[in-house]
């Protein structure tokens, strides 16, 4: 049984690391170079949360829980919010409540202040602040105009931290930020300005759903390898998207009904776009087809009409 678990863990690791590596024998691939698997493994290992919960430990945990998705978001989520034994205590300092973990880090659990410019600390009572937890901003800042700046040690922003926070106008994200959980800024419909740091590797599903006033989405300096499902859906004012060359997959409804979107680049690594990813935008599908991008079976709906996808047989 122990040997079987090791094999399953290894397979999960390989699946995660190779999920976006293009097949060099596939006729539809672009000129992207294949990703160095060894380098990716080193990058994953460098994000070890704790000696007591390594990436390999997470893979075993994910397998035991029957997890379908294996990624950094779920790794962080398991350690900080699911497995109880790692949290040591809760405390409060100034305008922030926080939780302390066995790896001597802290995660902000609540903001009790009333400032319009909210700056999360780099450290709190000597602990590096590595995450913003599931703070209920919606009940206190639903309409008040605010700006948010993350601390220099922040690695992740939890899901739904700022969702339905209609008043949030500007977000300044730190270099070092690695993951934005699913739904983190959903329905932040006053948000007009946000930067995406070069260290960012994952943005979860629907993280910026219905952020109506974001006009430009500059992801070009990030390390994203996919644009998650619904990530920027209903961003009605978004006119331009700049993707990093590392993106190889754009998932379902990623830019769904971004009705102003007319400009998006095609990364060299991109090989797959879901049929609904660009539905309701002004993007010309022909540009992607000519680059050999796989849209999958069926039709893609754009600008209120169906456009057939003329795919070559593989």
Regions found by a protein language model. Give the residues of each.
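N-terminal, intrinsically disordered, polar/charged segments of Gram-positive cell-envelope systems
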Residues: 25-51, 55, 60-67, 71-72, ...
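C-terminal motif of bacterial Sec signal peptides marking the signal peptidase cleavage site
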Residues: 18-19
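Consensus positions within tandem repeat domains that build extended binding/scaffold surfaces
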Residues: 159-161, 181-184, 204-207, 228-231, ...
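Acidic, Ser/Thr
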Residues: 111, 135-140
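Short, conserved catalytic or interaction motifs in soluble domains
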Residues: 22
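Structural signature of tandem-repeat unit edges
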Residues: 49-52, 63-73, 95-97, 101-105, ...
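Generic recognition of long tandem-repeat/solenoid scaffolds
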Residues: 78-89, 103-111, 308
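Positively charged n-region of N-terminal signal peptides that target proteins for export
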Residues: 1-6
